[in-house]
Amino acid sequence: MIRICPSILNADRDNLPSEIARISGESDLLHLDVMDNIFVPNFTFTFEESKKVIKECPIPVDSHLMIADPDERAYLYAKAGSASVTFHYEASLNPMQTISRIKDEGARVGLALKPATPFQEIASLMEHLDMLLIMTVEPGFGGQSFMLDMMDKVKQARKDIDSRFFGKIWLQVDGGVSLETIAQAAESGADTFVAGSAVFNSDNPGSMVDALRALALKSSAR
């Protein structure tokens, strides 16, 4: 199954409800990028702002936490109603405890890897995850170029997911996903795609979601 998750990082912040309405009918989840200006050099949403988006969004929210203290705060985003909460392995001192706290609140749990973090470093945690997020840009800003060299990591993760977990763990890519790059990611084994600039900078965001899905389906064996 292919999933398209538009990121509101590049949406019009002053008109978020209408921006979300433009893609909600075509999208599987809304990707909420939470940045604290500590773990990454950018700030996006406060927790209160995030709660408002989660509460009012007509489709499930996938909260991606680029924050320095996920061990203390990640579960709060699950408690606020996120369907899925993803935190960064690099920011966590106790990933197993954080995974458990998110699951205890009833949300799916994802683990994100920055480009420099090898897949093998988190292989032992895979059995506890619902999703693995492989960053295809350096986290912090939208509109960056897709890192094609991350496809080896995606292929490695896909092989592990299929061989050990029968394909049940979602494999997400985030960063630079567009009509020009989604095919490579799908061919490499990704099944869940975050797209920000490509969607919200287009004339018709909903149609762009459909176009991205069609390309991913055509390029994927999943």
Where are the regions that the model predicts?
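Structural motif
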Residues: 25-26, 56, 80, 105, ...
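N-terminal active-site wall of soluble small-molecule enzyme domains
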Residues: 31-101
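Glycine/Thr-rich beta-alpha phosphate-binding loop at enzyme active sites
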Residues: 29, 36-44, 48, 115, ...
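Hydrophobic faces of well-ordered beta-strands that scaffold small-molecule active sites
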Residues: 4-7, 30-32, 61-65, 85-87, ...
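Glycine-rich phosphate-binding active-site loops on the catalytic face of alpha/beta enzymes
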Residues: 87-93, 136-145, 188-208
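Conserved, mostly hydrophobic/aromatic
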Residues: 16, 23, 33, 77, ...
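Catalytic cores of alpha/beta
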Residues: 20, 71-79, 117-128, 177-193
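Alpha-helix-loop-beta-strand connector modules within alpha/beta enzyme cores
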Residues: 43-63, 101-110, 150-171, 212-221
